[in-house]
């Protein structure tokens, strides 16, 4: 048989893992992202009206029936998450505000799924590390200024915040719209991405390569470590991560990416 025939046969036999990615706003509003949310615009997800809505969202996503749930929590925190989830199953832990627990724990309980931590920090080049090391230098301060007063400010795409007016479910549907995800990636290609310490250098591009692109590649690598026995994987991360993670899943021969809005928009 030809190499092409063997390759085709192997592809037919290989069963890709199904993946559902859910991009979220952070339910506990830590305000660590570029877009800050003022206290008056925040919601308390522990209030009865939002708890009822979160239960509905969890039940919709549980229809995917994941074997594994991947969450935005440091890889080194796996033992702590396992302990909290075990306590939750035993009725000895009250869920915190975070989407990790409000959605991740609920769905894992409903589907008897295993939870996996997958967050990581990106690595920077030695030159960028040196730049970030001392915030008293003019070079550092000029770089910081590129965040605050960027000539590209008018080009940034801001998330439309509708959770307070319309609810959590409409917000999640909006955040996971492919058009919105594509716009979001554009934010990482302007502003400080174009910053140059010296004319013609790549300070901004190198910084963003480590902070965002390398970080998400590492997250993807952590997800690849999920056991192959998991036929269906639900990934719950901040919505911005989907601008790279979804693309990686779409390109990978190991996974079949499904549309999360097909689940969120169902009436069940």
Model-derived segments and spans:
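Short catalytic/ligand-binding loop motif for oxyanion handling, primarily in non-cytosolic enzymes
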Residues: 28-31, 77-81, 124-128, 242-245
């Amino acid at each position: 048989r030809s190499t092409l025939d063997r390759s085709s046969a192997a592809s037919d036999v290989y069963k890709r893992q199904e993946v559902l990615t859910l991009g979220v706003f952070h339910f506990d509003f830590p305000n660590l992202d570029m877009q800050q949310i003022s206290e008056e615009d925040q919601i308390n997800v522990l209030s009865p009206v939002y708890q009822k809505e979160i239960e509905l969202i969890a039940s919709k996503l549980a229809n995917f029936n994941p074997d594994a749930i991947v969450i935005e929590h440091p890889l080194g925190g796996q033992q702590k998450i396992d302990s909290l989830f075990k306590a939750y199953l035993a009725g000895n832990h009250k869920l915190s505000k975070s989407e990790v627990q409000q959605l991740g724990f609920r769905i894992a309980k409903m589907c008897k799924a295993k939870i996996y931590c997958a967050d990581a920090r990106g690595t920077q080049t030695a030159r960028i590390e040196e730049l970030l090391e001392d915030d008293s230098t003019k070079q550092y301060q000029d770089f910081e200024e590129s965040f605050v007063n960027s000539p590209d400010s008018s080009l940034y795409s801001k998330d439309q915040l509708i959770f307070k007016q319309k609810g959590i479910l409409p917000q999640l549907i909006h955040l996971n719209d492919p058009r919105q995800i594509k716009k979001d990636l554009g934010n990482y290609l302007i502003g400080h991405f174009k910053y140059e310490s010296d004319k013609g250098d790549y300070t901004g591009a190198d910084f963003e390569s480590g902070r965002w692109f390398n970080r998400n590649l590492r997250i993807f690598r952590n997800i690849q470590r999920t056991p192959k026995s998991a036929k269906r994987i639900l990934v719950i991360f901040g919505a911005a991560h989907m601008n790279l993670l979804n693309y990686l899943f779409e390109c990978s021969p190991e996974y079949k990416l499904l549309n999360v809005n097909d689940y969120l928009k169902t009436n069940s």
